[in-house]
Swiss-Prot record:
GO process annotations (BP): defense response to bacterium; defense response to Gram-negative bacterium; defense response to Gram-positive bacterium; defense response to virus; determination of adult lifespan; innate immune response; peptidoglycan recognition protein signaling pathway; positive regulation of innate immune response
GO MF annotations, alphabetized: peptidoglycan binding; zinc ion binding
N-acetylmuramoyl-L-alanine amidase domain residues: 198-324
UniProt protein name: Peptidoglycan-recognition protein LE
Listed Basic and acidic residues bias regions: 1-16
Family of the protein in this entry: Belongs to the N-acetylmuramoyl-L-alanine amidase 2 family.
Residue stretches spanning the membrane: none
Listed SUPFAM superfamilies: N-acetylmuramoyl-L-alanine amidase-like (SSF55846)
Source species: Drosophila melanogaster (Fruit fly)
């Protein structure tokens, strides 16, 4: 067959292919348009403001967001945006030969920020990750996303938009414990010893290091401490069960169920909670103190700490200034504080 005949046959096959496509498939071709959102310009001033408030910043990439129907306007806005940029082109004759990575349809570039701020949400964030299957007798709301499950209070919103940053205001009292994986902890050198629960004693210490109200600095301090405890002290892991930062966060050390290496003579019968910093002349921040009290209450509620536990400080058990004179004075005013000296007398 001649070259002109091959070219003509190729054109005919292309026309047949285009004619055979359903509207749905053509729309999917159009939806492959590129939507690019530039990174949000995050300045040091804004970072400092975030550290001094109760805001948590989370990053969402291309994927799925679950929102309540109260905020269904978010999905409508995204859907309108996608519909406006994904208009279907009218295609004429198409001839493709000796080509790779061919794109048919619009290519739309959006140079700008797309930020969604959802406020007024009262449920736990994990509740929003759950999507209930549709009820048999529940009326089905017609949407463009018929495969998504939804109920009376939630709907799943799909889009091809990159949402770089989304801010939620979360009360510090409800903040979860930051797990070891978040501060890139190395694994224990040996198999950890299990702690017999519930524990009778809780020991308060300080790390005798610098303190900071910035999470990034506290993470660095904790990693340095773990490295020092393992390599210089020869211990199995970081000494403490939990650490409290002046940023108002609780950081997981050895956790609830593992024997620590914080207080000689008390490691097997207590939890060690250490404040990050040195508190000889000043107290930790109010957020740090509140979070420590919340951690104690959570330990009792979850069965890790005895209901009649005894709260003691490191300086009462060993010859040390820890947790610092100023913090020691504060701990003496807390419920469950136990005066070992009176018992010995």
């Amino acid at each position: 067959m001649s070259e002109s005949g091959i070219k003509k046959l190729s054109q005919e096959r292309t026309r047949e292919w285009l004619a055979s496509q359903e509207d749905e498939e053509l729309e999917s071709i159009a939806e492959s348009s590129v939507v690019d959102s530039l990174d949000y310009d995050y300045t040091e001033e804004e970072e400092d403001a975030d550290q001094n408030t109760s805001e948590e910043i989370s990053t969402m990439t291309l994927g799925t967001q679950i929102a309540t129907k109260k905020h269904s306007i978010i999905s409508d806005t995204i859907r309108d945006l996608m519909n406006s940029i994904n208009s279907i082109q009218t295609l004429g004759n198409v001839n493709i030969s000796n080509s790779t990575n061919v794109h048919i349809g619009n290519v739309t570039n959006i140079n700008g920020n797309i930020q969604i701020i959802a406020d007024g949400l009262t449920q736990n964030r994990r509740d929003r990750r759950h999507v209930s299957p549709p009820r048999d007798n529940a009326p089905k709301t017609p949407t463009h996303f018929e495969d998504d499950y939804q109920d009376e209070s939630e709907e799943r919103v799909r889009s091809d938009v990159f949402i770089r940053r989304q801010k939620f205001k979360i009360p510090k009292e409800l903040s979860a414990i930051i797990p070891r994986s978040s501060w890139l902890a190395q694994k224990p050198m040996d198999e950890p010893l299990p702690l017999q629960l519930p524990v009778k004693y809780v020991v308060i210490l300080h790390t005798a290091t610098e303190s900071s109200e910035k999470r990034a600095i506290n993470v660095r301090l904790i990693r340095d401490m773990q490295c020092f405890h393992i390599e210089s002290r020869g211990w199995n892991d970081i000494a403490y069960n939990f650490l409290v930062g002046c940023d108002g966060n609780i950081y997981e050390g050895r956790g609830w169920k593992t024997v620590g290496a914080h207080t000689l003579g008390y490691n097997r019968i207590s939890l060690g909670i250490s404040f990050i910093g040195c508190f000889m002349k000043e107290l930790p921040t109010a957020d740090a103190l509140n979070m420590c009290r919340n951690l104690l209450a959570r330990g009792v509620e979850d069965g890790h700490i005895s209901t009649d536990y005894r709260l003691i400080c490191h300086c009462q058990c060993n010859s040390t200034e820890s947790p610092g004179r100023r913090l020691y004075e504060e701990i003496q005013t807390w419920p469950h504080f136990y005066n070992i000296e009176e018992e010995e007398q």
